[in-house]
Amino acid sequence: MILVTGGAGYIGSHSVVELYKKGHRVLIADNFSNSSPLVIGKLKTITGQEPDFIEVDLCDYNKLKTLTENYDISGVIHFAAYKSVGESVNAPLNYYENNIQSLINVLKLCKERKIDNFVFSSSCTVYGNPEIIPVTEQSKIGKAESPYGKTKIISEEILLDFYKANPISICNLRYFNPIGAHQSGLIGDYPDGKPNNLLPFVTQVAAGLREKLSVFGDDYNTKDGTCLRDYIHVIDLAKAHVNAIDYSSKNKGKYSVFNLGTGQGVSVLELLNTFEAVNNIRVNYEISPRRTGDVEAIYADCSKAEKELNWVAELNLAEMLSSAWKFQQKIVT
């Protein structure tokens, strides 16, 4: 059985679907800080299976230990974390406390229960503002532009130290900008309150739920002055996690790092224009000042994941944007 922390969240829920497809049994652990309890029922609708689920704050180790003791856990995929760059700038202590303590507790559980297969949800934020793009797994770990990014750097250091003392199989996945939704329209990126990421803001403006989108900065050194990102369909990303848990189980005692993206840089304005064209709808936006913590440009070299995980992103930007709009329309209706 695979323990999926944050399994009701955006990336976690899609990964649960893909794990079921590959025949894995899944235990979801979540406290719904970034998600909704309704997701559990939607996962049942999509997969046809009743997910095993525990509601727990991972910062409470005793409760985590108690609630998992009756499950035969062979591997962990650790998604659970606060994830907003902007929010982390305003509430850094919350991010350090939650993101670091939850990781420590899950690793303690692995050590105590002798769980030797661990996949970690890291981020391209660890590269900071890279000097050379595309970034490879060998690229320099940069100066994080936000407390959120710093929690990922610290988490990676904790993982490596833990591995040196307890040589279990660890896959550290540095992924780029996941967007899109499940083809059913039942699960997707549904932020609680004001969106922190670009695409949910775009879809909410398109749906008439918000007046306009703020594009933060048009004076960056990029092709159109707006930030450049590597957007990846959440389903492709979910499939990579399944490959990673299988890879980890076959490569005992190995510590691995993988970039997960498409390898293509897309600007904010390119994304907006493509969204409008694909979905035949206009999005009202305005140019605003730069936002603290934003990196100018980053995209991935994913050749290592292709070679070792036998994984490559398959879904294109148009498919990402059309699926996200389908999900938003289902929410509205």
Which positions does each model-derived feature cover?
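Short acidic, glycine/proline-rich loop/turn micro-motifs
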Residues: 183-187, 226-227
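Glycosyltransferase donor-binding loop in the core domain
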Residues: 59, 83, 95, 194, ...
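N-terminal Rossmann-like NAD(P)+-binding domain of SDR-like oxidoreductases, especially those catalyzing
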Residues: 1-181
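Short, basic/glycine-rich phosphate-binding loops at helix/coil junctions
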Residues: 180-182, 219-220
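Short-chain dehydrogenase/reductase
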Residues: 96, 145-153, 188-196, 200, ...
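C-terminal substrate-binding subdomain of Rossmann-fold SDR/epimerase-dehydratase oxidoreductases
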Residues: 199-333
